[in-house]
């Protein structure tokens, strides 16, 4: 019996994978700052294995190259753990409320990448609570530097895909997010 991935216990203790990733990044920045100031530190308790070295001339598929580039590597192989920087994040109105709640709990002050919020699922005949969400969610997204489309502007995939470049890595808050170029990962 083995637990896969190796980080699952740490993810549980941290309250989830996102919190573990944030904790590791904060810890790494704090350690770097302490080293610059000459302050002695201990190694962090939670470490994930570094990607195994790839041999010189290792062939990669286009998808492996795109994800690797977004993670600062020439490519990735099956079993590698990487944290690629997404170029685009799509959000739609039915999941946007949960996204806002998570970001508020994390005290987010701005988006790290291009964030596009659409209102394509409730635009046709919004109930009064939908209209309120459309207004308040758009204000929230704009305040954090994202792009909030207006109700009736169209479907997120059509509008969002206009922002894609061939090397982009992105994600969207539903099961059918896909980019016509680049690579995308559905989050729903």
State each model region's role.
Residues 1-188:
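Fe-S-dependent hydro-lyases/dehydratases of central metabolism
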């Amino acid at each position: 019996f083995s637990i896969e991935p190796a980080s699952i216990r740490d993810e549980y203790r941290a309250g989830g994978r996102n919190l573990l990733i944030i904790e590791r990044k904060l810890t790494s920045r704090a350690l770097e700052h302490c080293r610059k100031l000459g302050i002695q530190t201990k190694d962090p308790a939670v470490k994930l294995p570094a990607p195994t070295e790839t041999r010189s001339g290792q062939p990669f598929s286009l998808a492996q190259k795109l994800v690797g580039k977004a993670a600062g590597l020439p490519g990735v192989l099956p079993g590698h753990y990487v944290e690629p920087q997404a170029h685009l994040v799509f959000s739609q109105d039915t999941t946007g409320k949960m996204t806002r709640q998570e970001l508020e709990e994390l005290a987010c002050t701005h988006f790290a990448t291009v964030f596009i919020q659409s209102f394509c699922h409730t635009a046709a005949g919004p109930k009064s609570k939908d209209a309120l969400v459309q207004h308040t969610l758009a204000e929230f997204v704009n305040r954090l530097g994202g792009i909030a489309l207006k109700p009736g502007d169209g479907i997120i995939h059509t509008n969002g895909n206009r922002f894609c470049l061939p090397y982009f890595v992105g994600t969207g808050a539903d099961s059918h997010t896909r980019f016509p170029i680049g690579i995308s990962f559905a989050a729903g």
